[in-house]
């Protein structure tokens, strides 16, 4: 038996990559901090009903489940931190006004997904609770874009949709849940013929609108076509107006904005605008987010909510290979001047590795390209 083998889609993060991930994590949490977002660390394990209540069937399938040996109750290992943040806002903080929370912790999923194709993403995100207006959506979206730009990503494309459009069509036609699910699946695959077949028994206006959703994608000019192609329902009109406002409010961040009205990611979870960020060199979304006003109700306190999250391990997969900073090799010993020089260099942020007695100091293995040497009574740095 090879005891060093790890489970499928579970892997170690080695020093160079780990150092870069940790550096980016700190930068992003500092960014969130100056925007007023407070850092929280939810538990890795919770009672199952707390983790998946109000989040839809997909999260249930993604959650590893164990039996608590203390109580006999079923517990789950978190697969998404967003519901935990909603629980903290609803019960632990219990604020009446707006609250802003952020997090950066590992989650565990039963199947691999995301850019890194891992079952153990490092989920980092920000959530805003207590405000239902488009202004909070814009705040979250701008924060997401800034976070990606801090990581050195450019040429970002942000794709938007709004689940209220599809939801309004479903409600106005009184479509039953089974057909609703089939239409949802057909729209996600942009299968126009399947949508037409499924909607064949519906009112002609609704049928044409559902079919039109598969083609309603593009830049902001597409929204004008959507206004003509979709029924004049109040919820649809508001959704399109909100999407139009988004394009105007992100124009200063040097990103491309697009719209795809058939994209319904998290339809059973989100309640309004949804969005995803893309960049060249990545096979999937860098970050995803949206509005989820109903989730807090599962914890006894419904609160408007919007947020975004990303997998930090996934985002770094397409960055240039990580390189550890070179170190300085210092000789063994307790000479006061030597120790003082070592500490002074470390205060400057330089990596200094002091050799240990009776142990060979391999400069290459230690990633050292220079050493401390004593010259004329002074400790100096010399390159190897």
Task: Give the predicted meaning of each segment.
Residues 1-83, 138, 159:
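TRNA-binding/sensing appendages of the translation machinery
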Residues 17-35, 47, 82-95, 101-153, ...:
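Positively charged, Gly/Ser-enriched RNA/tRNA-binding surfaces
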Residues 44-60, 161-171, 264-272:
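Beta-rich nucleic-acid/ligand-interaction surfaces
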Residues 62-69, 175-197:
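Acidic, His- and aromatic-enriched active-site or binding-groove loops in soluble protein domains
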Residues 65-77, 183-188, 288-290, 375-384:
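Short, basic, helix/turn surface patches
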Residues 132, 136-137, 159, 166, ...:
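Cap/lid and interdomain-hinge subdomains that line or gate substrate/regulatory clefts
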Residues 155-166, 183, 258-264:
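Short, surface-exposed recognition loops or helix-turn segments adjacent to catalytic cores
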Residues 162, 190-191, 219:
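Short, solvent-exposed helix-helix connector turns and helix-capping sites enriched
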